[in-house]
Amino acid sequence: MREVNMVTALTAAAVAASATHLAACGLGLQKLRRGTKLLLMPLIAALYCAMARSPSPVVLGAMFCGWAGDFFMIYKHREAFLGAGMAAFGLGHILYVAHIGVLAAAAQPRLFTALAATLVPGAVALCIFFVLRRRIPKALRLPGLLYGLLLASLGSAAFIGLRAGAPGAGFLLAGGCLFLCSDGILAFETFRDGDSNAADVAVMLTYIAAQALLAVGFAAG
């Protein structure tokens, strides 16, 4: 009963923080947006710990990287901070993919499934990169390409796990797809279209949903 109450309380806190953050994005309230952004991952990590029977240090490490990435991306228009944010999220994705890989491998996926799941998200990431490559600073082009492929591998690993019947893989796949959507919107906003409140809301709505679904999926696994 205490566990249920804790999950309920943390869910309510995460929803409240998320709603406040999205409202701040939509209204252009920068101080409130920055403050609430740094609350999101600690709340999601706490919710994961409350839901999981045995929380994985690998998943918690990935969530910490997400929190660090959130901090750096507040200042995304400074090239050094953008690079640091990509590095933090990239490391987080490596940890996420590693943990999903363990779940997927245990379910013994078929080779064809693994190949198909790898090619489709990878093609999406490559398309986004080649559309934007001339607008991306030269120093960030290779890291950006590698980051996109790493992000695609998150969805690939989750799909492999889903087809193989791994527990929680449906949530992980949905989270991986939303992560790709979020970062795709962010890439266009940063390198082509310029900032807008609507784009900020879209980026953060899909990002929050992605991280929450990953937390639920990992807790189920």
Residue ranges and their predicted role:
Residues 2-221:
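Polytopic alpha-helical membrane-helix bundles and their juxtamembrane interface segments
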